[in-house]
Amino acid sequence: MAIERTLSIIKPDAVAKNVIGQIYSRFEGAGLKIVASRMAHLSRGDAEKFYAVHAARPFFKDLVDFMISGPVMIQVLEGEGAILKNRDLMGATDPKKAEKGTIRADFADSIDANAVHGSDAAETAAVEIAFFFPEMNVYSR
């Protein structure tokens, strides 16, 4: 399997619960390296641009409102099969359907406040990483 990079966001609900370290431990325990990381409080404009793919969906406004409701942790994860590995760690979008032991099953409250975001494909990951991290701010290790 190839070494990949994927974007991960710890959303405002999980940041407010003070579980950033527990989530980072899961990434690292699964063999993923954190090669870039920063905390940010997204502006409405940034959240709307980042989630533009969902602009026509009925949940778009609520998603943007949620993502700007508090700070988020944004990180780039690197490792073999990083995209799928991160998605497996996150669990199903709806925490009620997420497998026990996944990030969403353990830390999320609802399908809206679902603790984490992760890129769904290599193409998406490249676009999402570039959105938050200029290349010079991502470091292989």
UniProtKB/Swiss-Prot annotation:
Look at the named UniProt entry and state the broad enzyme category this protein falls under.
Answer: transferase
Reaction equations catalysed: a 2'-deoxyribonucleoside 5'-diphosphate + ATP = a 2'-deoxyribonucleoside 5'-triphosphate + ADP; a ribonucleoside 5'-diphosphate + ATP = a ribonucleoside 5'-triphosphate + ADP
Cofactor(s) for this UniProt protein:
Mg(2+)
Q: Where in the cell is it found?
A: Cytoplasm
Primary site of residence: cytoplasm
CDD domains for this protein: NDPk_I
What family is reported?
Belongs to the NDK family.
Q: What is this protein called?
A: Nucleoside diphosphate kinase
The organism named in the record is Burkholderia ambifaria (strain MC40-6)
The lineage, from the top, is:
Bacteria, Pseudomonadati, Pseudomonadota, Betaproteobacteria, Burkholderiales
Q: Which gene encodes it?
A: ndk
